[in-house]
Amino acid sequence: MQYNVQDLVKEVRVALDNNNSSEPLLQLGDGSTLSINEIIESKIADAARIILQEAPISLLGEGSPISGKIYWPSGEIGKGWGHILLPDNFLRLLCFQMSDWDISVSKTIDENSPQYALQKSRYNGIKGNPQKPVVAIVSWGTGLHLEFYSCTAGSNISVRKARYIAIPKIEAGKITFSEKLKSAIVYYTAFMVAQELSRDENFIKSLLEQAKELIK
């Protein structure tokens, strides 16, 4: 869902006011009311990114489709492992499933994972397969790639599901994220602002705890 950033700023101000019992908001820092609003706005995208990374899949919404050419290192379509170049704004995988897989994958590994080394083994029994597929997000020279292990269907193979969560970005005064995460993002933004402008550790901790509670 798309939100007006200025509306979110107002909600963050309310969260700060409602949770701060030690001193008025305007005394949190040396800035004016306008500068505090600017600080809030500057934290919203970062707060949204952190919450989107930490929230469970069930709260993330529909995301965006992954499209692009599939490359098959084996030289044979639909045999072995493949990879797809991910969009520049990729943040997190929502789901991925090839047409011959029994299940969809949302949890990924990277090149530093012990499981990743197994995918390069010459023994098929320990690599990802249509019954227990594995997806890795790996940095190539051309950008991030989604590597998937593996397929056996041959030339009739296709992508059944492929969706991702994009890095949140403020554009034309608006930002997009799942409505299920709105309250958590508001409170995490308030937490980040309080970290910068308040010395009250209990106040800061309270905001963080509320943000975390909202994504359980």
Role assignments for model-derived ranges:
Residues M1-K216:
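Glycine-enriched, solvent-exposed interface loops adjoining structured elements
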